[in-house]
Amino acid sequence: LRMLEGFVSLKPGDWIVQNAANSGVGRCIIQLARQMGVRTVNFVRRPDELREELTALGADLVVGENDEDVVKSTLALLDGKRPVLASNAVGGESALRLMDMLAPGGSMVTYGAMSRKSIKVPNGFLIFKGIRLEGLWVTQWLKHAPAQDIAAAYDKLARLMAEGSLVQAVDTVFPLSEVRRAVEKAQEEFRNGKIVLKMNEA
């Protein structure tokens, strides 16, 4: 929610682009953007496996991260528009693709570094496109944001979840007595959702 409301004034019909679209955050961005009438380009590593599932959540385009000439081919599908916001959880070459997609004056917000590779920004992206680079660390935002802003965000998210408009995939539910197994499962590279500990079961 902070990603979509805190950096760019999005309006219905705008496009945004994100990598790691199959992550928990990525799935939430898809659903929240749909609620706002904002359209999404979603880069993933396994598009054929994920396209149907992410489209059901509200994704407009699901694209292979490493497809050949992916920026040009994807922009051709946007009817002359470009995304005004990019959500970056990966870094490295993936972040460069996001910046290349952006409209002049667009913003890329980085909240993760899954590739563990630094972002090397071509000078032209800053000089000629005027792209803005920002970071998001929710822990820091929670420390400094006004209490009413935090409450409003939680209230909105809770309402959407209660309505069924915001869902989160769950891979496995473990009883508290199996916390070790839960941690091991959470560290696996490929999962189909969150790992949940059920606190009222031993």
Q: What label would you give each PLM region?
A:
Residues G80, A158, E163-T172, R180-A202:
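C-terminal capping/lid region of NAD(P)-dependent oxidoreductase domains
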Residues D69-K81:
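Short amphipathic alpha-helix with an adjacent loop that forms part of the alpha/beta core around
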Residues E93-S165, K198-A202:
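Glycine-rich phosphate-binding loop and adjacent beta-alpha segment
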Residues G13, A59, R82-P83, L126, ...:
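Local beta-strand N-terminus motif with an aromatic residue
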Residues V17, A86-S87, V109:
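N-terminal Rossmann-like NAD(P) cofactor-binding module of classical short-chain dehydrogenase/reductase
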